[in-house]
Amino acid sequence: MKKNYFHLTLLLSLIGISFLSAQDLTVEKMRFLTPHWNGERFEDGRPKVSNDILTRMKKVTIEEAWGVLRNEGYHNQFEGGWQPLHNDMPLVGRALTVQYMPNRPDLADQVIKNGKANGAIGNTNSWPIDRLVEGDIYVADGFGKIVDGTLIGDNLGNAIYANSKNGVVFNASSRDMEGLSDIDGFNAFVRGWH
């Protein structure tokens, strides 16, 4: 369990930033927000942490991680209260991060219109799935909503795993826990289950 919380903490603290909203971040803005990254980047500007590093991070303990994080000035980076799908499976990857505002008809129409104009298909919660690559984790802030805050079930979970070979971290709820549990290699940290 300690390793899982470390991996979640590290994920949320250090690896990649990208927001889905009415506007995506530009490559320039992504570079501005990640100035200390000197390595390769994805087309959208996200840091491309190597798969080798991601594999090695699965073996790092919380104690080791906290030492490094504190020495680098990362204090107060822990967020508790997660409900993992699998307690014994680490979740490590590059974050593709999105934020979902509470639904408002005046904004929702504009966001959907903009997304469709930019080639997005399906509902807004599926748009980031098309951008995932192997090693990514779909990280979504749904403002901790449990009721009316469900972002995925097992159908989208299968699509996420097909693209990323990884899982999700949702500050919101998910459903179809049984179906998601059947996806070999998929893990989720969420605020609640339906």
Indicate where each model-derived feature is located:
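Amphipathic alpha-helical packing elements
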Residues: 25, 29-58, 65
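Bacterial N-terminal signal peptides
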Residues: 9-18
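A generic structural signal for short, solvent-exposed coil/turn residues
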Residues: 4, 14, 33, 40-41, ...
